[in-house]
UniProtKB/Swiss-Prot annotation:
Protein name (record): CCA-adding enzyme
Family designation: Belongs to the tRNA nucleotidyltransferase/poly(A) polymerase family. Bacterial CCA-adding enzyme type 2 subfamily.
Organism of this sequence: Pseudomonas putida (strain GB-1)
Function of the protein: Catalyzes the addition and repair of the essential 3'-terminal CCA sequence in tRNAs without using a nucleic acid template. Adds these three nucleotides in the order of C, C, and A to the tRNA nucleotide-73, using CTP and ATP as substrates and producing inorganic pyrophosphate. tRNA 3'-terminal CCA addition is required both for tRNA processing and repair. Also involved in tRNA surveillance by mediating tandem CCA addition to generate a CCACCA at the 3' terminus of unstable tRNAs. While stable tRNAs receive only 3'-terminal CCA, unstable tRNAs are marked with CCACCA and rapidly degraded.
Residues binding ATP: 8, 11, 91, 137, 140
Gene giving rise to this polypeptide: cca
Length: 368
């Protein structure tokens, strides 16, 4: 029974990057032996166990073969006679197919260290093409390691083109696709993810609305550079789409509600935001009301940030509309409802009076 660190922990240590999660591989053990040592089984599809003290995952060495369509169409075989090399060859990239034993010796049968040195994302074997999810994973790794100069190897990009052309990407569930997109959006260079998908034809299959949309990627690049949260990055990515296709994309990928909401509001209101100073007071107040700046001020602030990231992505050095919009929102929020209530107004009459007072406040702000 031999235990190895595998995958990302080995890769990131060799790159000098922080190691967060550690995956462990057990070679030469049976399920019964693992149970006898106190490991707790958690794997539904293949033998994975939790360490009795650390809670970290330990997987038995296994092989796999294609048995159906999509990322889930595999049959696994785990037994004590599966070797380290047989387990590592089923992995996606050479830089993820290294192992390290308890003495610190690195096992690298597929030359992952060479590809780390050459800054290449290269597939381990032709079996790479059997799992369509790997197209998204490789694009995500390209986004993560772009600051270090990594690129996708030509032969791997060609395999990704073949997968995209095969229709296998259509077998991915919305949940799996979104999980990869979500993680990619939060990488250092998220625009690279979509550039790689575009280069291999996968973007046309998964997000045809974004094909050749360089402005969207420029806005996303700015959002990442300014360390914006997920929903802001998503809205930046969809900034150039009309409301109808934004709804289509949101529904197709089952994006989280916060992402859907901000992206759709941006699609509906980006033009007004960009023309904020020219809007009449009534239109400016309608914009504030649409975002419910009184109860949900952060949502309007997020919208302003999306507008700003889009402007910076378009090459503008600043976005003066941002402070103008914030000032208008502050003026409308400053209106005190108490005098209206004390005057005996209720219901619809109160709402209409409050709106009139807010309009006066916005008009005064515009004159200031």
């Amino acid at each position: 029974m031999h235990i190895y660190k595998v995958g990302g922990a080995v890769r990131d240590r060799l790159l000098g990057r922080p190691v967060s999660d550690i995956d462990w591989l057990v070679v030469g053990a049976t399920v019964e032996e693992m149970l006898a040592k106190g490991y707790r089984p958690v794997g539904a599809d293949f033998p994975v166990f939790l360490h009795p003290k650390t809670g970290e995952e330990y997987a038995l060495a296994r092989t796999e073969r294609k048995s159906g369509r999509g990322y889930g169409g595999f049959t696994f075989h785990a037994s004590p006679d599966v070797t380290l090399e047989e387990d590592l060859i089923r992995r996606d990239l050479t830089i993820n197919a290294m192992a390290e034993d308890e003495a610190g010796t690195v096992y690298d049968p597929y030359h992952g260290k060479d590809d780390l040195d050459q800054r290449l994302l290269r597939h381990v074997s032709p079996a790479f093409a059997e799992d369509p999810l790997r197209v998204l994973r490789v694009a995500r790794f390209a986004a993560r390691y772009a600051p270090l100069g990594f690129r996708v190897a030509d032969e791997t990009l060609e395999l990704m083109r073949q997968i995209s052309a095969s229709g296998e990407l259509q077998a991915l569930t919305a949940e799996r696709s979104w999980k990869e997109i979500e993680r990619a959006l939060m990488e250092a260079r998220p625009q690279v993810f979509f550039q790689v998908l575009g280069a291999c034809g996968a973007l046309h299959e998964l997000l045809p609305e974004l094909v050749d949309d360089t402005q969207a990627l420029a806005a996303l690049e700015q959002a990442a550079a300014h360390e914006q949260p997920l929903h802001v990055r998503w809205a930046c990515l969809l900034r150039g789409l009309a409301p109808a296709p934004i709804k289509t994309v949101n529904q197709r990928l089952k994006a989280p509600r916060e992402c859907q909401e901000l992206a759709l509001l941006t699609g509906e209101c980006l033009a007004q935001g960009n023309q904020a100073q020219e809007l009449p007071a009534t239109a400016l107040l309608e914009l504030l009301q649409k975002f419910d700046v009184y109860r949900r001020p952060q949502r309007f602030e997020d919208f302003i940030v999306v507008c700003e990231m889009a402007a910076l992505g378009d090459g503008k050095s600043s976005y003066p509309q941002a402070d103008y919009l914030r000032g208008a929102a502050a003026a409308a929020r400053a209106v005190d409802v108490k005098p209206l209530v004390q005057a005996g107004l209720t219901g619809q009459a109160l709402g209409e009076a409050l709106k009139r007072e807010r309009l006066k406040a916005v008009e005064a702000y515009k004159r200031s």
